[in-house]
Each structure stands twice: as structure tokens, then as C-alpha cells.
């Protein structure tokens, strides 16, 4: 059985603050990786939080360990561009996610 997880990631030490996100090292590989997770139904929502160095993601997975393992495969994790601050189970109480039938 799967559940939803809220994930907070932040820019790591390898992030280059002088260039936009789309010009970071291995941007295309990172974007392709995240798009593949979305196509699988694992990464449900994702995006940067305005005015911060953080990114909020909503994942559907079987456990926190599964979320950690999947994010560890991202080249931006491996190369230190992003690091995970926390992963917490999330109970959606209002609205629905597209294509989601619930818990």
C-alpha cells in the first residue's frame, strides 16, 4: 500500500548561485529523472518555494525509505546540488491529486 509524503529539499553545496536552475550542472538529466518519476506516479507535485533555496515535493510511495532511495538516484543528489531536509507522511484532506484515487 502506498501513501503520500511531503518532501523538503534544499540547494546543496554544489549549487551555483550565479546561474538559474536550468543552467545548473546536469539540468537535463535531473529534469528527465523527475519527469520519469512523475510519469510513474511517484512524484505527484514538485516545485521551488519562491524566495527560498527550497523545493517542495509530494511523493506517493510505500515508505519514507522508498522516497529516500528514489531521490538518492537523482544526479543532483549524487553531485550535491540538492539535499533532502525532511520527508514526512502527508494526509491530504481537501481536494484530490489528478489521477489519484486516494490512499
Where are these regions (language model features)?
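Conserved, structured core segments of small domains
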Residues: 1-103
